[in-house]
């Protein structure tokens, strides 16, 4: 229906359908995208791409419109051209290998230490610092051996409000 000012709206009869669609979207995120078994491989690929963007190995524009085959083909081509070690993370995911989840903590937005890690650059720096601290006391870890994953908030609201993104067993 058209509302005031030719804005598109949903009438009373369509409200249940829209609510059902939003609830189905939430269930899909909860069951699939937020599941720990999916989060680790997603975080591995994400880290490879973030580092490639940061280091100029990839440009954001190159990633638009790619399907999975095109995306991974681009990463493989750049790995061959430039020998970029972080792309080994994405290749491991393609081979069915995933980092194990060693610690799963709920995100606490009231905790300044958690909020500090929302920025991707800060998170990459924290990962490097944590890997160095662990290496000083135990097994040697490189900067690619550890990933802190904080799922981005996803909006299920029409006004852009953010829904919580819990990890699911």
Language model: regions and residue ranges:
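Histidine-centered, transition-metal-coordinating active-site segments
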Residues: 1-169
């Amino acid at each position: 229906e058209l509302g005031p000012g030719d804005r598109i709206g949903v009438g009373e009869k369509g409200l249940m359908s829209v609510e059902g669609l939003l609830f189905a979207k939430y269930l899909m995120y909860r069951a699939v995208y937020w599941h720990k078994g999916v989060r680790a491989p997603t975080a591995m690929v994400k880290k490879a791409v973030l580092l490639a963007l940061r280091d100029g190995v990839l440009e954001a524009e190159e990633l638009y419109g790619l399907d999975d085959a095109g995306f991974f083909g681009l990463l493989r081509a750049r790995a061959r051209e430039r020998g970029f070690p972080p792309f080994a993370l994405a290749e491991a995911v393609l081979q069915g290998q995933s980092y194990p989840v060693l610690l799963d903590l709920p995100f606490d937005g009231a905790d300044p230490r958690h909020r500090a890690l929302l920025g991707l650059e800060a998170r990459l720096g924290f990962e490097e610092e944590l890997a160095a601290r662990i290496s000083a006391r135990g097994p040697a870890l490189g900067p690619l051996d550890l990933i802190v994953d904080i799922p981005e908030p996803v909006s299920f609201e029409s006004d852009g409000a953010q829904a919580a993104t819990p990890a699911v067993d």
